[in-house]
């Protein structure tokens, strides 16, 4: 599942604008398969995912405060979530996870926001999440979720908190 597809299903199941969520989603050129080398199906799948986000009412582009965070979702009752999203690409999953963690840490300013990492619901990605200790997750107020076209679930370590 490509990064833009993970964003689509995460918003669909976890942050639906129809339930009062205000969602900003930043999309870069690589996610749209513009520039670089991509699998033949990526551009079309990305186009479908982006169209779905737009149809749901997601604001495409940087967030006014959090800039190029992948997703910023705000709800009057549920608070504000800053989310970094990874998907399948030519990059090693471990390196993608470290990059996403670093991006989240750079967004942390002591505010009472929630932070989330979202990846495809696949065993290889779940194994990467197991590298993040429960202590670190608690300290960072960070949840790790696995996303598919069928729903969103917390990984084993997050669910045990």
Residue ranges and their predicted role:
Residues 154-161:
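Short, surface-exposed amphipathic charged segments that create phosphate/polyanion-binding patches used
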Residues 86-89, 121, 160:
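A short beta-strand motif that forms part of the nucleic acid-binding face
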Residues 67, 100, 128-129:
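Amphipathic coiled-coil/heptad-repeat helices and related helical stalk/stem segments
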